[in-house]
Each structure stands twice: as C-alpha cells, then as structure tokens.
A protein has these predicted regions:
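Helix-adjacent hinge/juxtasegments
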Residues: 57, 68-72
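Core segments of cupin and vicinal oxygen chelate
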Residues: 12-54
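N-terminal beta-strand motif that seeds the catalytic metal site of vicinal oxygen chelate
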Residues: 1-17, 75-78
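A short, acidic/glycine-rich surface segment
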Residues: 32-34, 40-43, 62-68, 101
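Vicinal oxygen chelate
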Residues: 1-2, 35, 46, 89-128
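Exposed loop/turn and edge beta-strand positions of beta-sandwich/beta-sheet ligand-binding modules
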Residues: 5, 41-43, 74, 109
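Short amphipathic alpha-helices within nucleic acid-binding modules
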Residues: 22, 86-91
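Mid-chain, well-packed structural core segment of small domains
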Residues: 71, 78-85
Length: 128
C-alpha cells in the first residue's frame, strides 16, 4: 500500500454557524460546497485552503463534547504552516481569538503557537 497524501480532515462542530465563521473568517478558508442534510438535521461543508480541499466541517444535533485535555487519545491538533508567526498572532488578536504564547521547537528552532476552534479543538500555526 502506498498513501499519496492526506485528502481531508473531518471536524464535527456543535454550533455550525460559529464554526463556519471561525474557519472562513478567522482562518481564511473558502467554502467549496455546503449541503444541508435534512434527514440528519446537519450540515456537511467542504472547505479549501489556498484552493485545495482540506477540511470537511460537519454539524450534528447535540454531539458529545470533546475529550478533555490535549493528551486524550485520538486527534491531538491541526497544524498549519505559516510564513510569519508574529503576523498570524496579531491577526488572531484583532479577531479576538485567545492564544498561547509563541514557543520555539527545541529540535528544529521553528516557532509555533496554539489556539482553539469554537469547540476547543487545538490548532497550531507553525513557521520555520
């Protein structure tokens, strides 16, 4: 078996409009397709980063909360490569998004910062 690449990442949200606004207005993703599924009372929306499909955003009525803590089993966080951490941090701040302090990865010297989506999923910006 030979994997080619990561095709997409599926994210389930508890408040569709809030999460859609976060991923599009804060992170700058574009909506490729948006479908309301009446039989499930849910949305399925495909989001692109730089024109490439990357995130599949789902809403479901009353989803269970995310496990607490970043060290819970399963997906730990989403990481996005950026050119300039300082510019990204300033933009997060102007949009009212709380974030951790910028840190330096000791093995590579790369800089990174964590913040959370509306449902508490950790997101990382990473710059080398």
């Amino acid at each position: 078996m030979k994997l080619k690449s990561v095709h997409h990442i599926a994210v389930i949200c508890s408040d569709y409009e809030k999460s859609k606004a976060f991923y599009t207005e804060v992170l700058g993703m574009e909506v490729l397709a948006e479908h309301y599924r009446a039989e499930r009372d849910s949305y399925k929306t495909d989001l692109a980063l730089n024109g490439n499909y990357i995130v599949e955003l789902f809403s479901f009525p009353h989803p269970p909360p995310r496990p607490t803590g970043p060290e819970a089993a399963g997906l730990r966080h989403l990481a996005f490569a950026v050119d300039d951490i300082n510019v990204c941090v300033r933009e997060l701040e102007t949009k009212g998004v709380a974030h951790e302090d910028v840190r330096v990865e000791p093995f590579t010297g790369c800089r990174f910062v964590f913040f959370k989506d509306p449902d508490g999923l950790p997101i990382e910006f990473y710059a080398c």
